[in-house]
Regions:
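Alpha-solenoid helical repeat scaffolds
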Residues: 123, 169, 200-205, 237
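Periplasmic OmpA-like peptidoglycan-binding domain that tethers envelope proteins to the cell wall
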Residues: 31-44, 217, 250-254, 282-352
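C-terminal/domain-edge helix-coil "capping" segments
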Residues: 1-15, 101-190
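Short, surface-exposed beta-strand segments enriched in small/polar/acidic residues
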Residues: 15-31, 236-246, 263-300, 318-331
Length: 352
């Protein structure tokens, strides 16, 4: 990819060295950063330093982004034997793209495949701890810029319009992963105040930093915004963790301690909006599928029940469904923190 980069970009003068920033690589389905995506970023930086001196790697910061450098992005996407994202991941498709902010176009692309044994999908702390997932235009734009494109194509506007906020988010994630929760909160709050800062991952970050700092009331307030965001985008996946093979939540208070707050907030935000919801349980692809379907339905009903208890008006506006492992997002079948999203409970807005 580096060797084939079309430099200088059309309409720009040649340079002895080209500034490059790396917007951290992510999982192509969930948008999460993992042990492997982080390691790949380090490896690419080392490669440019040692083999491609024409590239001058800079920190991914708002100040450096303002100078319109090249931006390196990439995705790791689990695929099955048919190279599709459904079902169990039997390989990983690695997509890399080098984008020029000055011209607004891609200058190079790279594609490779890796076996699962060489990939550690364990999410970094922020993504492991994030309470919920929803479709986020910022992440969607990143993925669409990398996947299904070729050199010379324009950078997806969903990504380009949010890259300043993305640089602040990257710094905030690093601060959270390092346990610097006040710094993380300040950075997430700063990202939120930018023109394109109202992003799902930003709200997740403000919630998590407040919770870690012991500010439960502030965390509850932000979780309400998380719920509203998900419902506004028609889909909210919440990481309720259950005991293996059971409909009961895990007993570890570090994991399930916030669940009463989540349930109360979901009930409050849903009951006031007049929306109808399908509550859908999911499982990872381990065990017989008929049992997975039954278990996922029971878990959906287990979550639905306290919502109706907190707000009786929801009884006529919610249905429960279970889809087993038909809609995995990770697909590793590891049944640990790396594939928690495969065991999510999802709230989808449906017609009343």
């Amino acid at each position: 990819m580096f060797k084939n980069a079309k430099l200088p970009p059309e309409g720009t003068p040649a340079q002895a060295r080209y500034a490059v920033v790396i917007d951290p690589l992510i999982d192509g389905m969930t948008g999460a950063q993992s042990v492997t995506t982080q390691a790949m970023g380090v490896r690419l930086t080392k490669m440019m330093h040692e083999q491609y001196p024409q590239f001058d790697v800079k920190a991914f910061s708002a100040a450096n982004v303002a100078k319109s450098p090249l931006v390196l992005i990439g995705t790791f996407t689990g695929v099955n034997a048919e190279r599709k994202t459904a079902g169990t991941s039997e390989a990983y498709r690695i997509c890399l793209a080098l984008a020029d902010l000055r011209s607004g176009k891609l200058v190079s692309k790279g594609l490779a495949f890796a076996l699962p044994d060489s990939v550690d999908p364990t999410p970094l702390a922020f993504f492991r701890d994030a309470p919920a997932w929803s479709e986020d235009p910022a992440t969607e734009g990143y993925i669409k810029t990398c996947q299904g494109t070729k050199a010379g194509d324009p950078i997806n506007p969903l990504y380009l319009d949010r890259i300043v906020a993305a640089s602040l988010v990257a710094e905030a994630i690093d601060a959270y992963d390092a346990g610097r929760y006040q710094d993380a909160l300040d950075l997430y709050t700063g990202a939120l105040s930018t023109p394109a800062g109202n992003q799902f991952r930003v709200l997740n970050g403000i919630y998590l930093a407040n919770w870690k700092l012991g500010r439960q009331q502030q965390a509850e307030t932000v979780f309400a915004r998380i719920v509203d965001y998900g419902l506004d985008h028609q889909r909210l996946a919440v990481k309720f963790l259950f005991r293996p093979g059971s409909t009961a939540f895990v007993q570890d208070p570090k994991l399930s301690g916030p669940y009463p707050v989540w349930l109360k907030t979901i009930a409050t935000q849903t009951s006031g909006g007049g929306k109808c919801l399908e509550v859908t349980g999911h499982t990872s692809p381990t065990g017989p599928e008929p049992l997975n379907e039954r278990l996922s339905l029971l878990r959906a009903e287990y979550v639905k029940s306290p919502l109706e208890g907190a707000s009786p008006v929801l009884a006529k506006r919610m249905i429960a469904n279970g889809v087993g492992s038909k809609q995995t997002m990770v697909g590793t079948g590891r049944d640990d923190a790396s594939d928690a999203l495969d065991r999510r409970v999802e709230f989808k807005v449906i017609g009343c």
